[in-house]
Amino acid sequence: MSFDTLELHPTLLRAVAALGFTAPTPVQGSAIPPARDGRDVLACAATGTGKTAAFMLPILHRLLAGRRRVTRALVLAPTRELAAQIDEHRRALGRYTDLGGTAIFGGVAMEPQQTALRRGVEILVATPGRLLDHLRHPYARLDGVEIVVLDEADRMLDMGFLPDVRRILGALGPARRQTMLFSATLPPAIVTLARDFLRDPVRIDVERAPAPAAGVRHTAYPVAREGKVPLLLDLLRRPEVHNVLAFTRTKHRADRLATALTRGGVAADRIHGNRSQAQRTKALAAFKAGRLRVLVATDIAARGIDVTGLSHVVNFDMPDAPESYIHRTGRTARAEAAGDAVTFVTPEEEMEFRSIERAVRRPIHRIERR
C-alpha cells in the first residue's frame, strides 16, 4: 500500500513525500480511509505506531473544504509535551495548506493562547485542564467543532482527566460530529467513554511497538535541565563516541541544540518539520558521510533514518512515551551490531524514566557525574 491509494488531497500527499514517508503504517492504512470519509474511529494503538498522522491527515483532508478562522477540529492530549508534538505534526503535514492551528497547554502564559483563540484557528490541540481554563471566557468558542480526537485516552484516564474530557465533550453541544479515540489499552472506563461519545465506530487494533533491540547498551545520566548541553559536549570528548543521533522533543530545541554544539566546536546539524526536504537530505547525507558528528532530530523528522555504524543515540530530551524510546534507540545496534543509548534524565522526568525502564524490561544503569 502507498499513500497515493488513500485518496488524500494532493497538497497532503506532497507534504507526506517531502517528509520522506513512503508507505503508511498499519494504523494509518486502517484508520485513514474511514476517518477521511467521516466515520468515528476507535483505535487501540500505542505511541510509535504512526497514530498521529492516522488522525491528522484525515483532519487536514476534511478541513480543506469549508470555513476558515473558526475552530473546526479539536485534539485533546494528556500532556503538554504530547500536545506540542501533535501540533508539530500538524504543521509538518499541513505545510502546503492554508489551514491554521495552535496548541494550548499549561505551564506557559495564557495571553498568546487567548490571542490565537480570538483570531480563530482551524485545528486546536489542547490539554484538558488548560482548555477548560479558556472555556470560562467568551472568546473560546467550540460551537463550530466538527471533528474531535481523544489521543492517548488511557493516559488521560491514569492522570485523572476523564471528568474534564467529559465536560469538554459535553460543552461542544448536540451537533453531529466525527469523534476518534486512540488508546494504547482499552480499560472499562475508556470503553464506556467510547460508548457514550462515538457512534458506530470503526474498530482498529494495532500491535504494540516491538521490543528493544538486543544489541543496545542502555545508560542514563541524571542532570539538571541547564546542564544538558555541557554534559553532551563532555560525552563527545570521549573517543568511543564516534557519531550521535540526538533527539529533542521540539524543533525549536533542535535548533538551539545544534547551534550550541556548533559553537562548542562540534560539527552538527538538525532535521525537523520546518526544514525543507533539501535541507534534511543534505544534513542526513553529511551525517552518513561522516562530515557531521551529531545530527539533532525530532521524532517525526527522524522517521525512516537508517545510519550504518551509528555508535550512540542520545535522548537529549525524554521521549513522550516508552514506545518512542524503543523506536529512537533501535536506530543504533542495527544488523546485530552493538550500540549505545544514552538518556538525560532531569528530576522532573523521573516518572517518565521509570516507565521507560519497564518498557525495556530491566533497570537502566545510571551514571552520576562527579
Language model regions located:
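Conserved helicase RecA-like core
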Residues: 2-370
